[in-house]
Regions:
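Alpha-helical interface subdomain recognition
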Residues: 1-79, 83, 89, 101-106, ...
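Fold-independent oxyanion-binding glycine-rich loops
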Residues: 75-76, 102, 125-128, 144-146, ...
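Flexible, glycine-rich active-site loops centered on histidine and acidic residues
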Residues: 95-101, 123, 135, 177
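A short, Trp-centered hydrophobic/proline-enriched beta-strand micro-motif
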Residues: 117-125, 170-171
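Short Gly/Pro-enriched turn/cap motifs at secondary-structure boundaries
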Residues: 129-132, 158-163, 207-209, 234-241
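Short, surface-exposed charged micro-motifs
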Residues: 138-140
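A short core secondary-structure module
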Residues: 151-227
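Flexible, small-/acidic-enriched active-site or ligand-binding loops
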Residues: 207, 222-251
Length: 412
C-alpha cells in the first residue's frame, strides 16, 4: 500500500496551493464581506485547466482522476470555502451528470464550455418539500409536441444564477401519475450500471422506493419560463451563488432528457456519491486551514511571558486537530481511489462526508477558541471558517442521511 502521491498528484496539489495562497487568500475576506461572486478567480481556474479536472481531454477536460480533483478542492477550501464550493458544485454536480449520462451530442455541446470555465453548471435537486427526501420531487415535466414542459421550483441551488451560468440539470417527475415507472436501457458512459450499483446502498433507493418516475433534464440559462430568484442571505459561503429556481411553462427540446426516461433517481444517487467526495475534501481543507491559522496565532500570541503554543492545553488542541485531519484525509483519498478503480464507493464516500463535516466544525471551533477574542473578529480567517463549516454537516446530504446510507451499506 503506497501512501505517497504520484508526481502528477503532487504537481496538482502544489499548483493549486500556490494559486490559493497567492490569488484567493488575499481577497477571500473582501469577497465574503461584500458577498461578491469570484468571477476573476473562476476565470483563472479555467485558464489553469482546473474547472474540468476529472474529465477527458477530448471534451476539454484536464484528463485527471478523482484524487487529483479532491486534492484541488482541499487546497482551495484551505483558504476559502466559497471558491471551493463553486468548483465543487460545478464539477461534481453540474458537469458530471452530462459526462456520465449524457448522449454524445450533449457532451460535445456542453462539456467544452463547462470544462474551460467559460460557463458554470448547476444541479437542481432540492425542493421545498424534497430535501433529504429527494424522492418526493414535485417538479413535473410533461411531453408535448417534441418538447418537455416543466413546472416547479428548486431551492438552495449553487451556481445557477451567475453571469456565466450555462445550464442546470434538474430532476422532474415525468410520469402522468406518481406511480413508479421508467424504461430500461443504458445511459451515458456506464450510467445505468453505475446508478444501479449505487442505488442499492441508499435509503429509498430505486424509482420504486421513490414512488415516482423521475428523470433528469437539462435546462439552459435564458430558457423562457426558467427564472433564478434572488440569492439567499447565508451564514457562510457568502461569495458563492446560492438561490431558488422556478420553472413556469418552461419548454425545452425532448432531446434535453439526460439518459433514459425514468432513470433520474438512480442517476442522482450516483451523482450525490461523487459529490460527497468533493465536499469531504472541502471539510479536510477547511479543517487544515483552521489548524494552520491556529498554529500560526498560537506561536505569535504571548501570555504569561511565553507563546501560548507552549502551554499544554493549547498543544493538546493542536495535536488532536492534526491527528484527526490526517485520518480524515486518508478516508477521502480512499473514496476517490475506490471510485477511480471502478469499485462501489458509496460507503466510503458517506463515511468521509460524515467524518470530515464534523471535523471541520470542531477544528473551526477550536481555532476560534485558540484565537480568543480575536477569533470573534471578522478580519481573522478563523471567524469565516467557523461560519463556513456548519453547512458541511448539512449540504450534499445531512449527517443523519450519511448515517442511514452507512447503516444500509453495512446491512443493518
Amino acid at each position: 500500500m503506497d501512501f505517497d502521491l504520484s508526481p502528477d498528484h503532487e504537481l496538482i496539489r502544489r499548483t493549486v496551493r500556490e494559486f490559493a495562497e497567492g490569488e484567493v487568500a488575499p481577497v477571500a475576506e473582501e469577497l465574503d464581506r461584500c458577498k461578491a461572486f469570484p468571477y476573476e478567480i473562476v476565470a483563472q481556474l479555467g485558464k489553469l485547466n482546473l474547472m474540468g479536472i476529472p474529465f477527458p481531454e477530448e471534451y476539454g477536460g484536464g484528463g485527471g482522476d478523482s484524487l487529483a480533483y479532491a486534492l484541488a478542492v482541499e487546497e482551495l477550501a484551505r483558504v476559502d470555502s466559497s471558491v471551493a464550493i463553486t468548483l465543487c458544485a460545478h464539477t461534481s454536480l453540474g458537469t458530471q451528470p452530462i459526462y456520465l449520462f449524457g448522449s454524445e451530442e450533449q457532451k460535445r455541446e456542453w462539456l467544452p464550455r463547462l470544462c474551460s470555465g467559460e460557463q458554470l453548471g448547476a444541479f437542481g435537486l432540492t425542493e421545498p418539500e424534497a430535501g433529504s427526501d429527494a424522492g418526493n420531487t414535485r417538479t413535473r415535466a410533461r411531453p408535448l409536441d417534441g418538447e418537455w414542459v416543466i413546472d416547479g421550483a428548486k431551492q438552495f441551488i449553487t451556481n445557477a444564477g451567475t453571469e456565466i451560468s450555462g445550464v442546470v440539470c434538474i430532476t422532474a417527475v415525468t410520469s402522468d401519475s406518481d406511480e413508479a415507472g421508467g424504461e430500461s436501457g443504458e445511459g451515458g458512459a456506464g450510467g445505468r450500471k453505475a446508478g444501479e450499483a449505487t442505488a442499492r446502498a441508499h435509503p429509498g433507493a430505486g424509482n420504486a422506493g421513490a414512488g415516482k418516475e423521475i428523470s433528469n433534464i437539462l435546462v439552459p440559462n435564458g430558457t423562457p419560463g426558467y427564472e433564478q430568484g434572488e440569492p439567499y442571505r447565508k451564514m457562510g459561503w457568502n461569495a458563492s451563488d446560492t438561490r431558488p429556481l422556478s420553472f413556469t411553462d418552461c419548454h425545452v427540446p425532448e432531446e434535453n432528457l439526460l439518459g433514459p426516461r425514468g432513470q433520474g433517481f438512480k442517476q442522482f444517487l450516483h451523482i450525490l456519491d461523487i459529490g460527497r467526495i468533493g465536499v469531504a475534501a472541502m471539510g479536510v481543507g477547511l479543517a487544515q486551514g483552521a489548524l494552520d491559522e491556529a498554529l500560526k496565532y498560537a506561536k505569535e500570541r504571548r501570555a504569561f511571558g511565553k507563546p501560548i503554543s507552549k502551554f499544554q492545553a493549547i498543544q493538546g488542541k493542536l495535536a488532536d486537530m492534526s491527528t484527526e485531519i490526517a485520518a480524515a484525509r486518508l478516508l477521502v483519498h480512499k473514496a476517490a481511489l475506490e471510485k477511480d478503480a471502478g469499485r462501489n464507493f458509496t460507503l466510503t464516500a458517506a463515511q468521509a462526508k460524515l467524518k470530515t463535516g464534523r471535523l471541520a466544525v470542531r477544528c473551526a471551533e477550536e481555532a476560534v477558541q485558540i484565537h480568543g477574542g480575536y477569533g470573534f473578529i471578522e478580519e481573522y480567517p478563523v471567524c469565516r471558517f467557523y461560519r463556513d463549516a456548519k453547512i458541511l454537516t448539512i449540504g450534499e446530504g445531512t449527517d443523519e442521511v450519511q448515517q442511514m446510507v452507512i447503516a444500509r451499506a453495512l446491512g443493518a
